[in-house]
């Protein structure tokens, strides 16, 4: 089709949403998929493949990344795979098996073969706290939720444990019962705010980054910090050069310096550091307090290990250092640098930046300094913003200063979804862990059912890729800049390839994608095959080529395994629930069937052998191997667990070091290094990208869109922040609204006094509402959105009788809005409104009002008055089932007005659009480095640069400004006031009568 684009019209690749489906047998569909895999791999391999990809307009860097292998255009995603490790993560095993196909098509040896690209989950959802690897080197720190009860000071920031973690919220409530203090930081008066001792309201867009910097300043200035902890476990005593902004290296200071790390130390023996990695990170320098001399310090020199060496580093020092070559440089402790840096974040400036009262900021600083243990919990309310990296780093800073790390009830955590394949951790003594399942070598699979998982031969032929690049127009972040010309901001370890084949399971991928309508309109027409594997009819199914019906969890015919990020339980189940109601199969059986068909077509037994025990109906052999090879499950036997040897049948405790699970317990109590270059908790990053982008220090930045001020401005006068702006000046950014990618890379530094005088052109054009998109309690992402009672409960407009035929289903999606803001726009409670973001790129690029698809894609929904939200904030719950071409046609033509597609039965939750109508992909440069040193996800080893769900592009749907326009009245047939607002007048927001006001103020309570 690259050679003849007219075929995309002829066969409806450009209009999948108007095509229909045919039923096929499992054998037929397996054959179609297998033959398509072979054809796509062949089509995009070699020089002809490169030529075709070039004709399709892909960036040269992406084409080069294929390495001439068509298999690299094939993308696989196991959606939320921890919810079913064998079946759902099995999609990545399928991706690894593609090396067999590549070796055949390119006629290469196994060692030269390549597999597919593995798409992420955690980062693509925008759920990772992307700054955490910069601080401690781990993908993310999350505790068991029963540790919440041990906290004495609990701070929730952008987190809603009341509504969004209902099974575990009782642990949070126990804090109050046990005498702890609860604080909530959020723009709106949220459910957790109602449980709090005090609530700090802030301007959206992560203005509260400044709060944590101000708190840190107060703790330092007032000497409320834990000095031994700061010296022993943070990078604040290390010396930094003021010329290069790099940490001072021991080899540069001491003549004939011999590296100081012992091979018997934990860096090598426990954490898996290699010689090449050590050579890159080196040793560091402190100034000894007792002698006044400079001393080398290694990443193993933490905690008592440092003290036992007689080292007592200075915190407050600056001066000149003579280098080994005789030259001199100015250097300072990082502590001294932060004293300068934090001058921009006094109480007055911080209160102006975020809108919080100065007294409350000061109170929180005092509480964190004096109440122990203290914990800060962040969530998607933070991680869904562009500068979450900085905010995550900022929340750690006061905890680092006060020693609230590695102890029960203390820490900074970011629970946001059950994502952690790393629970099945690999170590040399245990075996390959998780990779023993997804990355077993397809050229040498173990066919002995009695073989230990430790002995499975592992080789990953795949490479990770962020679906965010697909969201981004199937493009890397490569920008034409005024001063540097065409510049690539996507590191080699992150570089995507063109997408020609998609296979995913357990995810409503298109519905949940940022810029979803842009994908449908502009990106997916170039994809040759989209395979959706799921348990319900979704919009993604409508826009796919093949939909494979998977069995639900209760219908599994074979054993499956799962674990959790928020509790310590391993769970195995299957084969004892309901028989499948329809012609569905377990996920692993679906994958195995296609593999078997590939082998039949290619006359190669290795494809079936790779799934041997699944095809034999014995996937528990793979589960046993997983248990054998993982540090957290080694020595467990499947049959023992199923027999109830460790408790309830099917359950056992994961073998963590502590109960509850306390991240970094070993670091603090056993003096092990953290998983960073310094071995310490890092308040500073000296990687080249961070220095270039102005983020070597933790700093407050405005977003590239969701701000009234200069897009992406760095609020700082620190002379040791020296960003490159690539010729994109403040004047240019304020004169007109520049392209989103240009705003993304604009790095301009100024004081708050200057920044608050600047303007965002989009704000000036009337896009003055921040759009928050939290999750609802009535769906999981988008799953179960079509359930009747979920629809009814999910909004104020639920009605099982659908008296108003405009309801798309038994309910209608709603937007929460401050009553005064709505009334100023002539909008009544219950009215329908259009919600629009920047029309230059949303709901999709090149949208015009006369395009029929624009009508489908423009967001239209109902307003719910909610005074809990400040004036310039609207809130729309995340991921309802979006409007599609078929659902729009249905509600416009059906007598009953339901938005249910005629041929598929797909039930939309909106008449028009989706909350994704107002989102786009923002490709954050700091998420795409090749130089960040951190721990690998699933093994005791280190790496530099990108890894999916670990250090990769985190999508940020909240980075948007919107305009709200009334569409039609909320009353019956679009006339007059919404019936409830009329009949319940006096009880609804903005219409409260005297009785209601008395009730709200507590005046109806009579004390005796």
Where are these regions (language model features)?
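C-terminal substrate/ligand-recognition segments
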Residues: 488-492, 496-512, 519-522, 532, ...
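Catalytic alpha/large subunits of respiratory electron-transfer oxidoreductases
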Residues: 1-555, 671-673, 679, 702
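Long, low-complexity segments enriched in small/aliphatic residues
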Residues: 619-797
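Catalytic or ion-translocation cores adjacent to nucleophile or general acid/base/metal-coordination motifs
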Residues: 191, 206-214, 533-543, 549-583, ...
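Phosphate/diphosphate-binding loops
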Residues: 519, 528-529, 535, 574-595, ...
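Long, contiguous, secondary-structure-rich segments that constitute the structural scaffold
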Residues: 587-639, 726, 730, 734-735, ...
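Acidic, Ser/Thr-rich peripheral helices and adjacent loops at domain boundaries
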Residues: 427-439, 549-563, 865-867, 884-891, ...
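Aromatic-residue-lined binding/catalytic grooves and analogous aromatic/hydrophobic interfacial grooves
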Residues: 209, 245, 379, 642, ...
